[in-house]
Swiss-Prot record:
Heme b b562 binds at H83, H182. The chain crosses the membrane at residues 33-53, 77-98, 113-133, 178-198, 226-246, 288-308, 320-340, 347-367. This is Cytochrome b. Its main location: mitochondrion. GO terms for molecular function: metal ion binding; ubiquinol-cytochrome-c reductase activity. Signal peptide: none annotated. InterPro entries: Cyt_b/b6_C (IPR005798), Cyt_b/b6_C_sf (IPR036150), Cyt_b/b6_N (IPR005797), Cytb/b6-like_sf (IPR027387), Cytochrome_b (IPR030689), Cytochrome_b_C_euk/bac (IPR048260), Cytochrome_b_N_euk/bac (IPR048259), Di-haem_cyt_TM (IPR016174). The keyword Heme applies. The gene is MT-CYB. Changing I356L: In strain: Isolate Pacific ocean. It comes from Tursiops truncatus (Atlantic bottle-nosed dolphin).
Length: 379
């Protein structure tokens, strides 16, 4: 008799996705991050659900409701810090996952890649509206600064900003709608992730060599289930260490001051995972130009499959491209550092140079390296 997992309509879907899925035999630990992102999403939804049970999305009580969660709710402090640091782990996994895709040419699965970019944007939106909810100083001023960027849009900008605010400033209406967005978006992310997986399973996984692996596949279970569990345990270990030893390491001390529209913090800056984009935004002295550069810094990912000039898919055997890839990583780290620094010399010029280099690497240097490597193949 055929196993129920292969015949039952629901079990069959799970079986084809996680058990009998043919997987390349040589994929490395860089392929772990997909499942780790799934784990992060589940953790964030669960911790977020329990936080929402005690949180009040109202300007007069939001800050004290978070304090109440940390002080009075059983293990509330733990749930709150798991959720806050879980977001950081989510972005670490996201950036590693995207980096893997860039390095090994996974972006050639175009539908999967484009949905991935959409997922990145949705997760970023979720993190942004979530950061506003504790209603501390950085929450309030972060919301004010970032929503204000939309006023750079010609003609409709100001109206659009006031429409998003639900008034003439960031206030009660803004907080309430941001809570609504923060609650609904993770479920949209879950649906998008399912579509992401659907398209991936149409083609099967890429592998480090970038060469088709149809002739050498192994079942996902038990080989990669056990490998993913190791990754998951490491992720949980790091998250627990962060949460239990240094819960505020990645946060901003300003957010422990209740929001005050009459007092601006000395340095307004987002969470660490947005600093690279924030640095690109600040490096352009024109408001609209900065907003466009900010958008393009993420949307440039969509153009990457079109910029593939190399005959080889992966960078595994392409030393020039490897050099440029790691230069890009160093550049992103530089931008992240600059985003957290005040706007003064020498940070301004370093930020501008790093921003130029970011776009130059992706749009010009890497495609050129691909062409040069094609020539070298003929030698």
């Amino acid at each position: 008799m055929t196993n129920i997992r292969k015949t039952h309509p629901l079990m069959k879907i799970l079986n084809d996705a996680f058990i009998d899925l043919p997987t390349p035999s040589n994929i490395s630990s860089w392929w772990n991050f997909g499942s780790l992102l799934g784990l992060c999403l589940i953790m964030q939804i669960l911790t977020g659900l329990f936080l929402a049970m005690h949180y009040t999305p109202d300007t007069s009580t939001a800050f004290s409701s978070v304090a109440h969660i940390c002080r009075d709710v059983n293990y509330g402090w733990f749930i709150r810090y798991l959720h806050a640091n879980g977001a950081s782990m989510f972005f670490i996994c996201l950036y590693a996952h995207i980096g893997r895709g860039l390095y090994y040419g996974s972006y050639m699965f175009q539908e999967t890649w484009n949905i991935g970019v959409l997922l990145l944007l949705t997760v970023m939106a979720t993190a942004f509206v979530g950061y506003v909810l504790p209603w501390g100083q950085m929450s309030f001023w972060g919301a004010t600064v970032i929503t204000n960027l939309l006023s750079a849009i010609p003609y409709i900008g100001t109206t659009l900003v006031e429409w998003i605010w639900g008034g003439f400033s960031v206030d009660k209406a803004t907080l309430t709608r941001f809570f609504a967005f923060h609650f609904i978006l993770p479920f949209i992310i879950t649906a998008l992730a399912a579509v992401h997986l659907l398209f991936l399973h149409e083609t099967g996984s890429n592998n480090p060599t970038g060469i088709p692996s149809n002739m050498d596949m192994i079942p996902f279970h038990p080989y990669y289930t056990i490998k993913d569990i190791l990754g998951a345990l490491l992720l949980i270990l790091i998250l627990l260490a962060l949460t239990l030893f240094t819960p505020d390491l990645l946060g901003d001390p300003d957010n422990y001051t209740p929001a005050n529209p009459l007092s601006t913090p000395a340095h307004i800056k987002p969470e660490w995972y947005f600093l690279f984009a924030y640095a690109i935004l600040r490096s352009i002295p024109n408001k609209l130009g900065g907003v466009l550069a900010l958008l393009l810094s993420i949307l440039v990912l969509i153009f990457i499959p079109m910029l593939q000039t190399s005959k080889q898919r992966s960078m595994m055997f392409r030393p020039f491209s490897q050099l440029l890839f790691w230069t890009l990583i160093a550049d992103l780290l530089t931008l992240t550092w600059i985003g957290g620094q005040p706007v003064e010399h020498p940070y301004i010029i370093v930020g501008q140079l790093a921003s130029i280099l970011y776009f130059l690497l992706i749009l010009v240097l890497m495609p050129t390296a691909g062409l040069i490597e094609n020539k070298l193949l003929k030698w």
